[in-house]
Amino acid sequence: MLGPTPELDQTLQAYDYLLPETFIAQTPLVPRDRSRLLVVQQQAHQHKIFQDLVALLQPGDLLVFNDTRVIPARLLGRKLNSELAQPVEVFLLEPRQPNTWLALVRPGRRLKPGAQIEFGPPERPLLRAEILATDADTRGRIIQFESLVEEPFEDLLEQLGEVPLPPYIQESTAQPEQYQTVYAQHPGAVAAPTAGLHFTPELLARLQSEGINQAHLTLHVGIGTFRPVETDDILQHHMHSEWVDLPAATVDAIRTTKASGGRVIAVGTTVTRALEGACQNGPLVPWQGRTNLFIYPSYQWRVVDGLITNFHLPKSSLLMLVSALVGRERLLALYEDAIAQQYRFYSFGDAMLVLPEAVIAERSPDPVF
């Protein structure tokens, strides 16, 4: 077993690896649950198919899912009072108030507070937006939308917007619903919680029939999920924040699972951040708020016992999170084998299951339940 190297674990370069571009999946598999699954055990690892998940978990285990839904966050419009009908791109980041959003706009330098943008056909625009202010933290804009027809903003967004794909997906023929989990419920994300893309309704039903329980929370994945770590010392990295809704039913399910000896398996890094972030200042309770928790090696775990996740970008905070479970050296060795076995990487790629027996990290001594 590879051992921890604490000082090296804090350096950004230690999380680098070489991935040929041909390994970056551009389209999702059909059916979803035919993707490959690298199963991380205590000493060894196995290569399986995602459908095998039923046999790899135990009755009494609890899968926790992120039920956020990706919104059509990219809008193309035109600036009003512009002689040249200047095109404007608006990328919604997060809601601030009803019909009011924080957004990135291009070209931003020409869009000052008071500027207006219209969307839809020029002869019959459907939606209008006004720039209210510049956000000091992101340099984005606070934008208020107004429907120009008898349809709510949410419906117009579905008509006019485009679901954004990650920047490394450039040649995809994927349909918008293929970048949604089958259990997506609450609109608000600008990127999918991709570990959940492998589940089908049939697989969820099989898991339930075998006594593997399911619970949900909501974390609206933000654009910060693609932001690289840029500081040589990762401890100097400022983690982006994301909005979380952890309902009482999920907290109860986690307590019941732990009390009966079951294991909590997070479906994705977003669920991991939400659960661990919710109990940083005390016991796990129902909670709504923002988390900017940065998980890296030496983190002491509180709730999560195991993890289902995709394969992540070099030098990313997500790679550091998974390293906090199994150790950085072992994770990079697993990635090396995945490349040798021609796994597909990133959002539309294959998956990894970190079983609880593979976790080498310490548990927090603080009471959580």
Swiss-Prot record:
It is found in: Cytoplasm. Its main location: cytoplasm. GO terms for molecular function: S-adenosylmethionine:tRNA ribosyltransferase-isomerase activity. Its EC number is 2.4.99.17. The keyword Iron does not apply. InterPro entries: QueA, QueA_dom1, QueA_dom2, QueA_sf. Pathway: tRNA modification; tRNA-queuosine biosynthesis. GO terms for biological process: queuosine biosynthetic process; tRNA wobble guanine modification. The keyword Ligase does not apply. GO terms for cellular component: cytoplasm. It catalyses: 7-aminomethyl-7-carbaguanosine(34) in tRNA + S-adenosyl-L-methionine = epoxyqueuosine(34) in tRNA + adenine + L-methionine + 2 H(+). Monomer. Belongs to the QueA family. Transfers and isomerizes the ribose moiety from AdoMet to the 7-aminomethyl group of 7-deazaguanine (preQ1-tRNA) to give epoxyqueuosine (oQ-tRNA). This is S-adenosylmethionine:tRNA ribosyltransferase-isomerase. The lineage of its organism: Bacteria, Bacillati, Cyanobacteriota, Cyanophyceae, Acaryochloridales.
